Amino acid sequence: MAQTPPPESAPSTDSEPETALETARRQLQAAAEHVDIADGVIERLTHPTRVVQVSVPVERDDGTVTVYDGYRAQHDDVRGPYKGGLRYHPGVSAEECVGLSMWMTWKCAVMDLPFGGAKGGVVVDPKTLSADEHERLTRRFAAELRDEVGPSQDIPAPDMGTDAQTMAWFMDAYSMQQGETVPGVVTGKPPVAGGSHGRAEAPGRSVAIATREAINYYDIPIDDATVAVQGYGSVGANAALLLDDWGARVVAVSDVNGGVLDTDGLDTHAIPSHGNQPAAVMRHDAPNTLTNEELLELDVDVVIPAAVGNVITAANADRIQADIVVEGANGPTTSAADRILEERAVPVIPDILANAGGVTVSYFEWLQDINRRTWSPERVRDELESEMLSAWNAVRSEVDDGDLSWRDAAYVVALQRIGRAKEARGLWP
């Protein structure tokens, strides 16, 4: 198992799009200006603790063998074990994993969870794998990462191209090597295999909670609020359903194929998520259709980019008409776009706060696994609501007291907590 040196991004310009690592480092430096924290701590947080690279040989169904590259970036563990997703995607790279692991560190800290950040994955298009090949890939990847992961060391979770079944296979492969069942090695498992109720809906639920609180903060009655959601997968669909149930008017939703628009409000319960029915959005009977780009520029109270990164850029930030942007995806707004939106006084509720429901309920799952005690769905929802409101109030206080953007305020909360932990622990040796 090789450990690759931390990747070094070339100095970034304002050209679009940025890599996840460039964006994460820019955001760190911007927030550091507002925090009384040692320069040495910021320098340490600019780099990961380690990046592990492994080769993952897999026997294909036809008997041939394909070797895939796998990565695990572990950013910082001063507050607890590393935590972050595993993705199967052709675009996985060491640099991407480092950038995403940094976001996980901030996300865990802003939620005050006892974890640090990690991210990993395999360079593969999961659509090219049969179910059996997917399982063999996962089990071999788990075997290669055995020394790097564990309930007190590094706890993976689902991400792009992986799901609850992937996590069950990973947990089983790890457990077979350990000689005992270790459900806490991963989160996002099926409830029958040590998973938690409410995990799948958690990121969307937290986005909905953040949207509700933002609407309230800016004195918009929720019954009058109009919402557009780009990305109707698990995050976007669950957020839209909840906001619809709470009284907001969801006027547009989209998936990779395009979107639908009804200014009177869509019946979100009549539109299956992209994961359940990939073509359902465009088949929905609505007065108008639109592109993903057009959805982002609708004149609504809230736009929720919940699909992929780098969709709000310097090229379209001037055309965003929403009063509030709530980030459902990871990194949907580039740094250049952030500056433009801030100049235009368009608040952006950042991803590290808005979509933190996934890692928060992963924490609940980890607690349930460690204690061998299952929580009810109602308890999971109530605990998530409580954790989200606590984090929201901490960030809101920084916004109000420090005259900061929501992103800078969230980073300030995270960096203060990480800085205090590093100061208390010191630097060894």
UniProtKB/Swiss-Prot annotation:
GO molecular function annotations of the record: glutamate dehydrogenase (NAD+) activity
InterPro entries for the chain: Aminoacid_DH-like_N_sf, Glu/Leu/Phe/Val/Trp_DH, Glu/Leu/Phe/Val/Trp_DH_C, Glu/Leu/Phe/Val/Trp_DH_dimer, Glu/Leu/Phe/Val_DH_AS, Glu_DH, GluDhGdhB, NAD(P)-bd_dom_sf
Keywords, in A-Z order: Oxidoreductase
EC number: 1.4.1.-
Chain residue ranges for the region called Disordered: 1-20
Enzyme active site: 119
Pfam family, one: ELFV_dehydrog_N
Transmembrane residue ranges: none
SUPFAM superfamilies attached to this UniProt entry: Aminoacid dehydrogenase-like, N-terminal domain, NAD(P)-binding Rossmann-fold domains
UniProt superkingdom: Archaea
Enzyme kind, highest EC tier: oxidoreductase
Biological process (GO), any one: glutamate catabolic process
Subunit structure, interactors included: Homohexamer.
Other noteworthy facts: Strain NRC-36014 contains 4 distinct glutamate dehydrogenases while strain NRC-1 contains only 3.
Family: Belongs to the Glu/Leu/Phe/Val dehydrogenases family.
Name of this protein: Glutamate dehydrogenase B
Source species taxonomy: Archaea, Methanobacteriati, Methanobacteriota, Stenosarchaea group, Halobacteria
